[in-house]
C-alpha cells in the first residue's frame, strides 16, 4: 500500500547515512592521532619552538593530538613518565641523568650562555653582590645552576650571597623592582623589561662566550626504545617549527602572544627576535655545552667526574632527518 510518510522517511535515509559517513571521515585524523603530552619549564623565548609547533599546526600535521603543559617540574614529570617529551635546559636534564635517570636531549636551541645578570641601581659591581639576595626560579633550575657556575669567576660563591627561590620570570621581575631581591639572571629579552623598570645590567653572560647547552628538546631513552617513530615525527614537527620561526613572523608572534600571555607588540617582537637570532636550522645539541655543565656539576655530584658528555644527547633521529635532505629542503 502506498504510504507517502514511509516514502519520505526512505528518502531521508541516504542523506542521513551520508552525513554519518562524512562525520566519520572527518573524524579519522583525530581518531588516528597519537596522544602525546609535552612539558615546558619556563616562559622564556628559548621555549618558543614548542609553542610555534603547536600554534602553527605542525603537531596536528604530523599526526599528534598534543597536550602542551607548563610546569615547574618538567624534568620530574618527564622522568616519571607523566609526559613524553619536554622543552628544558641542558643543566636541568643533566642533574637528573647524573643521578641515575635516563633523559637525553635530541635537539638543542641554545649553545652558549646568553643571560643577563640584572641588579638594582645601587649594585655597581659583582663584588657589591656579597651579602645580597639573588633570586632564582627554584633550586636546581637553570637560573640557579648558571648562577652558581658564574659566581666563582668573580671571587664569589653561593655562600657569599643569599639565594632565594622566587619563581618564573614575571615573579622575579616583580621581586627585583620591589626590592625583595637585589639581583637575578634573566634571559633575553626579559632583561629589557628589567631595564624599563630602572634596573641595570651587571653582567652580560654572552660576552663571556661560554659553551653551555641551554634549552632543548628532551625525551627519555625508554621513550626512544618504545615509541621511536612517535619521537621521530615529533622531532620532524619541531624542525619544521624552527623553519617557521626563521621565516614566518606572523605565526611565530601569535604563538609568543599566546604562551607569554601578552598583547604588547613590542614585548612580543622582542621575545620572537631573541629566539629567531639564536635557534639554528639544524638544532644539534652541543657536546662542548654539556661538557661545561658536567664539569661544573662535578663539584656537587660525584657521578659527574666520570660522565661522558656524549651520553647526554641522542642525535640519531636528527641525523636521519638531516641526511634525508628534509631540513635543507625546508629552506629552498
Spans of model-derived segments:
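Secondary-structure end/capping motifs
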Residues: 225-305
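Periplasmic-binding protein-like
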Residues: 40, 109-119, 197-227, 231, ...
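Short, glycine-/small- and polar/acidic-enriched structural segments
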Residues: 34-178, 182-188, 201-211
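Ligand-binding clefts/hinges and TM-proximal coupling segments of bilobed small-molecule sensing domains
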Residues: 142-157, 161, 237-270, 313, ...
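Short secondary-structure boundary segments
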Residues: 90, 121, 188-189, 221, ...
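N-terminal secretory signal peptides that target proteins for export/translocation
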Residues: 1-12
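Conserved C-terminal helix/tail region of periplasmic/extracytoplasmic solute-binding proteins
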Residues: 295-332
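Bacterial N-terminal signal peptides
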Residues: 17-29
Amino acid at each position: 500500500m502506498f504510504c507517502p510518510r514511509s516514502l519520505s522517511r526512505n528518502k531521508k535515509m541516504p542523506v542521513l547515512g551520508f552525513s554519518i559517513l562524512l562525520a566519520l571521515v572527518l573524524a579519522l585524523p583525530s581518531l588516528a592521532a597519537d596522544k602525546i603530552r609535552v612539558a615546558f619549564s619556563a616562559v622564556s623565548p628559548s621555549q618558543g619552538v614548542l609553542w610555534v609547533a603547536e600554534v602553527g599546526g605542525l603537531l596536528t600535521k604530523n599526526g599528534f593530538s598534543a597536550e602542551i603543559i607548563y610546569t615547574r617540574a618538567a624534568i620530574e614529570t618527564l622522568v616519571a613518565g607523566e609526559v613524553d617529551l619536554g622543552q628544558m635546559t641542558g643543566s636541568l636534564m643533566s642533574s637528573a641523568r647524573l643521578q641515575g635517570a635516563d633523559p637525553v636531549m635530541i635537539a638543542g636551541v641554545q649553545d652558549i650562555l646568553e643571560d643577563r645578570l640584572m641588579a638594582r641601581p645601587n649594585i655597581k659591581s659583582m663584588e657589591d653582590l656579597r651579602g645580597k639576595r639573588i633570586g632564582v626560579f627554584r633550586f636546581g633550575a637553570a637560573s640557579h645552576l648558571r648562577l652558581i657556575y658564574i659566581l666563582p669567576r668573580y671571587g664569589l660563591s653561593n655562600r657569599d650571597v643569599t639565594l632565594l627561590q622566587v619563581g618564573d620570570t614575571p615573579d622575579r621581575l616583580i621581586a627585583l623592582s620591589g626590592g625583595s631581591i637585589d639581583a637575578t639572571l634573566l634571559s633575553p629579552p626579559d632583561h629589557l623589561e628589567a631595564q624599563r623598570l630602572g634596573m641595570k645590567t651587571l653582567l652580560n653572560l654572552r660576552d663571556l662566550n661560554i659553551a653551555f647547552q641551554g634549552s632543548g628538546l628532551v625525551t627519555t631513552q625508554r621513550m626512544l626504545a618504545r615509541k621511536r617513530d612517535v619521537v621521530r615525527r615529533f622531532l620532524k614537527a619541531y624542525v619544521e617549527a624552527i623553519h617557521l620561526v626563521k621565516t614566518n613572523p606572523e605565526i611565530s608572534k601569535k604563538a609568543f602572544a599566546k604562551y607569554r600571555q601578552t598583547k604588547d607588540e613590542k614585548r612580543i617582537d622582542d621575545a620572537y627576535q631573541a629566539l629567531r637570532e639564536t635557534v639554528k636550522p639544524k638544532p644539534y645539541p652541543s657536546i662542548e655545552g654539556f661538557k661545561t655543565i658536567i664539569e661544573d656539576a662535578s663539584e656537587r655530584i660525584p657521578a659527574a667526574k666520570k660522565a661522558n658528555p656524549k651520553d647526554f644527547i641522542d642525535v640519531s633521529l636528527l641525523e636521519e632527518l638531516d641526511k634525508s635532505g628534509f631540513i635543507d629542503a625546508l629552506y629552498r
